[in-house]
Amino acid sequence: MRQFVPRKGKCMREVYDFLKKCGTYYLATVEDDQPRVRPFGTVEIFEDKLYIQTGKAKPVSKQMVANPKVEICAFDGNTWLRLSGEMVPDERVEAKKHMLDAYPSLRGMYNENDSNTQVLYITNAAAVFSSFTAPARTVTF
């Protein structure tokens, strides 16, 4: 019997919906040989890619430029998600505007036309959904 493999867009949407439901997720990067983890809340789908947002002046931005491999972790009270992949900066105004339109409260600190706003999308993504009551399930996009 052939196993059903979801389309990449459906897998990305499932990850997006889970992150939105959680509200806050934790982004792990590496600085030299030291892991760094901090809370994040921005996540959007734009042009069939999963994006996050930060500021170029922040250490997290510099860490992702030096080593684009990241892991995101989120927990909804029952299930947790570990999403790994590589972040790719997108300097286009359209991508920045889409993110800031989705999070208007950030407009006090960021603007799609400034030199600080940074949006990045994830590639080579693998998301593992886990819980104490069900086997782990992996999706990729």
Which functions belong to the PLM regions below?
Residues 2, 26-27, 41-50:
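Short, basic, glycine/proline-bearing loop/turn elements
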Residues 2-4, 82-141:
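Charged, gly/pro-rich active-site loop segments
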Residues 43-78:
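A short mixed-secondary-structure module that forms the rim of ligand-binding clefts
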Residues 17-31, 70-72:
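A short, Trp-centered hydrophobic/proline-enriched beta-strand micro-motif
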Residues 1-11:
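Short, Lys/Arg-enriched N-terminal segments with co-localized hydrophobic residues
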